[in-house]
Amino acid sequence: LGLHTEAMTDGVLPLLKSDLLTVMQATTNGTLADVSVEFSTGSACCVVLASEGYPQKYESGFAITMSEEAAAHCYVAGAKKDGDTLLTAGGRVLGITAAAPTLRAAVEEAYRLAEGVAFANKYCRSDIGRRALAAQKERE
């Protein structure tokens, strides 16, 4: 489990080859031009698991369970610990991120991993990556 709250960043960080702390410190110090920021080839996809009703009215406080494999690819957003239990505590609950050699493989893997997460009122969009995959297909 990682802690982060921006799905767009969660979909890029797995591709970062450079040391994140070094990049952040250089950004803070105004020396980013002196740092080599490198990304691996391939693609990544982050599927956000939200509370049903988000962004309007939603309920929270539900126990979250997940497979070990899903937990290894999970960024926590709207969740909190209560003892040993992870509970929903917001609208955007978790981001499940997968990286793969191709966009199609990354999208499929992220959705497969998302199936390993359960909580009451879980909502998962089914269109993540669809437009990018369609555009990619048009270029082929």
Enumerate the predicted regions with their spans.
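Active-site "cap" helix and flanking loop/linker of ATP-utilizing ligase/carboxylase catalytic domains
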Residues: 2-71, 82
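Generic beta-strand/beta-sheet core signal
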Residues: 48-50, 77, 99
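Generic C-terminus detector
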Residues: 80-83, 87-140
